A protein has these predicted regions:
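A structural supersecondary motif
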Residues: 223-233
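Conserved active-site and cofactor/substrate-binding residues in soluble primary-metabolism enzymes
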Residues: 8, 90, 106, 152-160, ...
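N-terminal Rossmann-like NAD(P) cofactor-binding subdomain of oxidoreductases
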Residues: 1-200, 302-303
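Alpha-helical scaffold segments in soluble metabolic enzymes
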Residues: 16, 20, 45, 110, ...
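Short clusters of hydrophobic/aromatic residues that line enzyme substrate/ligand-binding pockets
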Residues: 67, 132-134, 147, 189, ...
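Glycine-rich beta-alpha junction loops
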Residues: 36-39, 82, 125-126, 152-154, ...
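C-terminal active-site/capping subdomain that shapes the small-molecule cofactor and substrate pocket
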Residues: 231, 243, 247-320
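Glycine-rich phosphate/diphosphate-binding loops and the adjacent beta-loop-alpha structural elements
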Residues: 193, 197-206, 238-249
Length: 320
């Protein structure tokens, strides 16, 4: 039986979630979309043409206050507040919260008040709402948790890799840098950005140092690593795909070959479908559209001694 979902927000994540759900209708039924700035013809245009993922293959038209995809009709609403949305009437039970505006339990509870049963925040929560990363701590999920966070794209890449390394060798300390593709909040020319002045600099001709909460979030989903990891971000002028650079001091002496073997084993067993092990000469565009949250690059790691290692893992920061 298909899971009945509603999508709140129609930015990059909302549109990608819709694309993926429509590809597997036996698993997901999209009951409704809420888009505050609704213009159905523009929504059709944004779905049909995508600068990163290419032209959408299905027929799509605007029809009767909604979108028609071949034989699938999805109603579209224009609500400013989640508690005004008819989730209950449409049958939507699980809400993909992708606006970026609802990051706390109190805010997401408005979806529940409107008839939804569960809410998945597609970003780190701003409060203590439970955070889960598949392959890392998803077995801790309980059915009474009605608002959860799926963490960030970077955390979903970093945490599975960190778990494999920590479980096998132990991590004493770790530093992480994500070399991250541009995002929608960045500016095409120098402009004001109050929270982070450097993020306000032009995206096309700068490498921009910034912050990331991904390493700290690893300490939430893997509590024994709390306080042992920290990191930063370098924003670069590419449209999609990012790479995690993890440097760690290990508790157990080992070799780089043994580390690669541990990651490969995990990719074939308990992390299958989450980690992909790659030993080819790859570059960033090779991972556009990758379903894996963590694409381990076996050829790019380096090691000094038997306890100090640098590891690289790629991820599609939109699709993955």
């Amino acid at each position: 039986m298909a899971i009945k979902i509603g999508i709140n927000g129609f930015g990059r994540i909302g549109r990608i979630a819709l694309r993926q759900a429509l590809e597997i209708p036996e698993q997901f039924e999209v009951c409704a979309i809420n888009y505050r700035n609704v213009d159905l013809e523009h929504m059709v245009y944004m779905m049909r043409y995508d600068s990163t993922f290419g032209r959408y293959g299905k027929k799509i038209i605007a029809k009767d206050n909604g979108l028609q995809f071949d034989d699938i009709f999805v109603p579209v609403f224009e609500g400013d507040s989640a508690d005004t949305l008819p989730w209950g009437k449409t049958g939507a039970e699980y809400i993909v919260e992708s606006t970026g505006a609802y990051k706390t339990y109190d805010r997401c509870k408005l979806h529940l008040d409107a008839g939804a049963k569960k809410v998945v925040i597609t970003a780190p929560a701003k409060d203590k709402s439970p955070m889960f990363v598949m392959g890392v701590n998803n077995t801790d999920y309980r059915s009474d948790m009605d608002v959860v966070s799926n963490a960030s794209c970077t955390t979903n890449c970093l945490a599975p890799l960190v778990k494999v390394i920590n479980d096998k060798f132990g991590i004493i300390q770790g530093l992480m840098t994500t070399v991250h593709s541009a995002t929608s909040k960045q500016k095409s020319v120098d402009a004001r950005y109050a929270k982070d002045w450097r993020i306000g600099r032009a995206v096309f001709n700068n490498i921009i140092p910034s912050s990331t909460g991904a390493a700290k979030a690893c300490g939430i989903v893997i509590p024994e690593l709390a306080g042992k990891l920290t990191g930063m971000s370098l924003r670069i002028p590419t449209p999609d795909v990012s790479v995690v650079d993890l440097t760690a001091r290990l508790a157990t002496p080992t070799t780089y070959e043994a580390i690669c073997a541990a990651v490969k084993e995990a990719a074939e067993t308990n992390m299958k479908g989450i980690i992909d092990y790659c030993a080819d000469d790859v570059v960033s565009t090779d991972f556009i559209g990758s379903d894996y949250t963590c694409n381990f690059d076996a050829k790019s790691g380096i090691m000094i001694g038997d306890d100090f290692v640098k590891l690289l893992a790629w991820y599609d920061n939109e699709w993955g």
